[in-house]
């Protein structure tokens, strides 16, 4: 086995970094999820995750030098959604979107600021997996949420015609990119030390 192959293998430090930043990111997600008790904020959740979560995620990217780290963090998010009461759908969704984000950052050889910002735009798409049951299985989705009240349910239904899902995907990417630019501005010295330009 070559030194290059060994160098591309994830080690204990890499997994520690994944765990730390996944925990920070998850806390942000759960804090923002509380706003979902208001219908409009339920719809805006993935976009808010993109902006606010984009800041620590950009810092995480300064630690990413090997393939697999972004994908694993995305998968952790999908699994945590399932564990906290969502369906299984976010898990495969997080694998697909995490793999795309991984490829984008890898394409920049972990040194491109443009790739870092675009990756930060793509990464929060994992959270859109939470919306699929809402759009595709409304009756089942609200069956377990009757305690929210009929007015809440009616408002959410009005806000979520099927075409809105594609708007949410685009808005999430745009807001993630905004979060990337904010992270770039706030964490300039970290990127300089990591050699990302």
Regions found by a protein language model. Give the residues of each.
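Hydrophobic alpha-helical transmembrane segments
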Residues: 15-20, 47-48, 70-75, 88-92, ...
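Aromatic-anchored segments of alpha-helical transmembrane domains
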Residues: 22-30, 76-84, 122-132
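Short helix-perturbing small/polar motifs within transmembrane alpha-helices
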Residues: 27, 94-129, 180
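Membrane-interfacial segments
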Residues: 32, 36-40, 64, 68, ...
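Alpha-helical membrane segments and adjacent membrane-interface helices in multi-pass membrane proteins
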Residues: 43-103
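Membrane-embedded alpha-helical hairpins and interfacial helices in multi-pass inner-membrane proteins
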Residues: 116-188
């Amino acid at each position: 086995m070559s030194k290059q192959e060994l160098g591309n293998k994830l080690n204990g430090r890499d997994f520690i970094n994944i765990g730390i930043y996944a925990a920070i990111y998850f806390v942000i997600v759960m804090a923002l999820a509380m706003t979902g008790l208001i219908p409009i904020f339920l719809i805006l959740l993935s976009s808010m995750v993109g902006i606010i979560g984009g800041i620590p995620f950009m810092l995480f990217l300064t630690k990413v030098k090997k393939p697999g780290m972004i994908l694993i963090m995305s998968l952790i998010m999908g699994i945590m959604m399932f564990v906290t009461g969502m369906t299984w759908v976010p898990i495969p969704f997080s694998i697909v979107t995490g793999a795309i984000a991984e490829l984008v950052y890898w394409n920049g050889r972990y040194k491109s600021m443009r790739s870092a910002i675009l990756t930060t735009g793509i990464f929060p798409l994992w959270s859109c997996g939470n919306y699929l049951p809402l759009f595709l299985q409304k009756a089942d989705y609200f069956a377990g949420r009757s305690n929210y009240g009929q007015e809440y349910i009616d408002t959410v239904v009005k806000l979520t015609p099927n075409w809105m899902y594609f708007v949410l995907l685009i808005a999430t990417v745009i807001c993630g990119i905004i979060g990337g630019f904010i992270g770039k501005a706030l964490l300039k010295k970290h990127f300089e030390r990591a050699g990302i330009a």
